[in-house]
């Protein structure tokens, strides 16, 4: 069965200030064994049996930065951070993206639609002290699906078309997280 995937994959090298690597991860937003309502009236996609493909409540991955900096700096996401997807706009509006959490601080909170159609300004992740060598910084990324959205027919049609090969490729959702280290005077 096809799946929705979140991929986070960015490399950046700023020799004067720092070097870091941002790893990649996959999040399955769709599973083929999920039943969200046992056939109750009005439930999304679900029937009395498990769906062909149905949304999970949420999936979480991790941005991992390996940071080295000789100077005091700020690590943050910049305007290269965006979503690329072939999902219809209607579905994009129901997918929420949260970068960060209450322990690390919320870096971004919005919808896939916002990230794919709008701009992203600089968002601070963490202050980096001078003489930092090989520090690993992790930031969670959570994508959640608003299940009670009244779009059962659309979601079912997309799932059926994907599973029967009506599309040339799977539906994809890629989050490109552009990150920078900025020197702090």
Question: Would you name each region that the model predicts?
Answer:
Residues 4-5, 50-120:
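Surface-exposed interaction patch
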């Amino acid at each position: 069965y096809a799946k929705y995937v979140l991929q986070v994959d960015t490399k950046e090298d700023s020799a004067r200030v720092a070097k870091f690597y941002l790893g990649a991860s996959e999040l399955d937003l769709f599973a083929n064994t999920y039943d969200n309502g046992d056939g109750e009236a009005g439930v999304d996609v679900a029937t009395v049996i498990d769906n062909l493909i149905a949304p999970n409540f949420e999936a979480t991955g991790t941005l991992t930065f390996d940071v080295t900096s000789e100077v005091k700096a700020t690590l943050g996401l910049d305007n290269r951070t965006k979503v690329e997807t072939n999902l219809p706009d209607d579905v994009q509006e129901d997918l929420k993206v949260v970068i960060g959490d209450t322990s690390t601080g919320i870096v971004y909170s919005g919808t896939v639609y916002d990230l794919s159609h709008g701009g992203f300004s600089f968002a601070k992740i963490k202050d980096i002290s001078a003489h930092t060598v090989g520090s690993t910084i992790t930031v969670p990324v959570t994508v959640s699906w608003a299940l009670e959205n009244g779009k059962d027919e659309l979601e079912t049609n997309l799932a059926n078309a994907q599973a029967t090969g009506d599309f040339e490729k799977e539906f994809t959702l890629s989050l490109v997280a552009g990150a920078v280290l900025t020197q702090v005077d």
